[in-house]
Amino acid sequence: MSIKEKIKEVAFLKKLLKRLYLKIRSDKFVKLSQREKTDAKLVVFESFQGRSYSCSPKAIYEYMQKAPEFADYRYVWVFRDIKSHGSFAENTSLVKFDSDKAYRAYARAGTWIVNSRLRDFIFPRADQRYIQCWHGTPFKKIGCDIEAAGNATSTVDEIRREYTKEAEKITAMISQSPFCTQKLISAFNLDRLGKENIILETGYPRNDELFNYSGEKVERIKESFN
């Protein structure tokens, strides 16, 4: 067997194992989703697939913590490394990414607030809302706009299917500009799905802080560079 053939065999086995793992996880989530009841006042947050406490999910979470109309809400943050994120408010729980507790949170929460694609098998029920914040302006081609060969783990067709499947479950998607809106519609196949109207061209919540600053904060930032 040549080196190229060996590499192809290893890649095939990895893909097979990944599909098996995802099938097991998918079956578990389906059972949880069928068993759990939706809690309208529970919100789950995830940023960059659990890698950080950041971006628009963080901005929305911190706004909701201060807003009196959400005083009786409870929250769940999904992290890959829970220990590195310190303490949160009493009304907030931390769960590990890709864990049973994380899937249970998604199965129960009335609202999901995320800035990157979720696992394919995590799908909301009719009484759940999935708010996709995304994480920037797609200046490079992503999703269904990709034309060149795929990456090391996915073909072009697989990437397009993944983005289309993601779009099918999104309730609302945030955009920061008309340019961004058109790119997101195209990348997520929203026009073909008849879902262009899910785009909310409000600007990214993470940018609100740039317009709501104080002189004291400006000076503090300047001092940090000295």
In which residue ranges do the predicted regions lie?
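Structured loop/turn residues at beta-strand edges in well-structured enzyme cores
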Residues: 38, 107, 125, 168, ...
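Extended catalytic core of nucleotide-activated donor transferases of GT-like folds
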Residues: 58-62, 67, 91-155, 161
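Receiver (REC) domain switch-region micro-motif
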Residues: 43, 112, 173
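Helix N-cap/beta->alpha junction signal
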Residues: 79-81, 116, 176-179
